[in-house]
A protein has these predicted regions:
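Short helix-initiation/N-cap motifs at beta->coil->alpha
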Residues: 53-57, 111-121, 141, 254-263
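Alpha-helical, coiled-coil/dimerization segments enriched in small aliphatic residues
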Residues: 96-98, 231-259
Length: 340
């Protein structure tokens, strides 16, 4: 079922707007979770321009739906593609992996500016009216340039709200409500309100259909690192996804999105399953080998019995691939034989 929500949306986009080539209720904020944040965009009526938006404390105004969009990070690129605005992408950068198959045709002819952050000059040469980034650091002096510089030149910028670093802007805990709220907000910014509403409805339905097959099991979300593993902690997308499938995160007590966790702590936690993040630069297979040759983890039952779940890196950051990742992990869990 992974990807069905997006596929259903794409099949229904032909008649809407601009066309382009292509363990509680996990969707509701619970105690201690951040309620969906309000913004100028989400408070404005659909199709209302000029449109004021704010992300990570930076305000911008879109006089009309952007026609020349640059995206940085897969999460931003895939959001624009999924909302049917791929024909307005004039450049992308910092791809974390291949786009989902159903979005590939829409992405095929979009120019790639850089493997990581592009130079600000390269972005400005494209004369964008919107630069949309998945990380706050993408739009910084060390990234593709400061947001203020773009603003001074009349270019609107937007950063995924879940990626805000300032405590006053960062969600206390990521929820599916917040992820779906970003879809709605970006849809409004692009003038693709109908497409956004369809995607949100499809993803809510897909999420509601998930059976939490990991109930009663503990898990380590292993992202990278061999000397010291870098793992999913208690307030980001990994925690949100594990909650949705019923898994108990062994690093849930760390109030951060990601954290370093010593191998001895991993061994002491003795997780029932290990979620392996599959990235081109650090594959799931490489992580399996690292776990099997590390004397601290080699004797863990989860390693010896290969109780592994695999999730692609682009699905580990807040965005439209989180719900399909839940569906996929639930299916993988259903196939594992783990004593409870």
């Amino acid at each position: 079922m992974a990807g069905l929500a997006v596929a259903a949306l794409l099949s229904g986009c032909a008649g809407s707007g601009a066309t382009g080539p292509g363990a509680a209720d996990p969707g509701v904020a619970g105690p201690g979770e951040a309620a969906p944040s309000s913004s100028a965009a989400s408070a404005s009526p659909a199709g209302a321009f000029p449109l004021a938006v704010s992300s990570c404390g930076v305000d911008a105004t879109l006089e009309e739906p952007p026609e020349r969009i640059v995206t940085i990070k897969s999460s931003a690129t895939e959001m624009v593609l999924a909302l049917g605005a791929g024909d307005r992408l004039v450049g992308t950068a910092f791809a974390d992996g291949d786009v989902p198959a159903e979005l590939a045709p829409a992405a095929a002819d979009v120019p790639v500016l850089a493997e990581k952050n592009p130079a600000q000059e390269a972005v400005l040469e494209l004369e964008p009216d919107l630069v949309y980034a998945g990380w706050e650091s993408n739009l910084s002096a060390d990234g593709a340039g400061e947001r203020q510089t773009y603003q001074d030149l009349g270019v609107a910028t937007y950063v995924s709200p879940s990626a805000c670093k300032g405590a006053e802007h960062r969600p206390e805990r990521l929820t599916f409500d917040l992820v779906l709220e970003e879809i709605t907000e970006v849809g409004r910014m692009l003038g693709e309100d109908e497409a956004a509403a369809e995607l949100v409805a499809a993803q809510r339905a897909e999420l509601d259909a998930v059976v939490p097959s990991g109930a009663g099991l503990t898990a380590l979300w292993y992202s990278s690192g061999e000397d010291v593993p870098y793992v999913g902690a208690g307030i980001g997308a990994p925690q949100m996804i594990m909650d949705a499938v019923g898994l108990e995160n062994v690093a849930a007590g760390v109030q951060d999105t990601w954290t370093s966790l010593g191998w001895e702590a991993v061994a002491e936690a003795n997780p029932d399953v290990v979620v392996l993040v599959d990235a081109a630069w650090n594959t799931a297979e490489h992580k399996k080998e690292a776990l099997e040759r590390n004397p601290v983890t080699a004797t863990l039952p989860a390693v010896q019995e290969e109780r592994y779940l695999v999730v692609p890196f682009p699905a580990t950051e807040a965005g439209m691939r989180n719900v399909p990742a839940v569906t996929d992990l639930a299916a993988q869990l259903a196939e594992l034989e783990v004593a409870r």
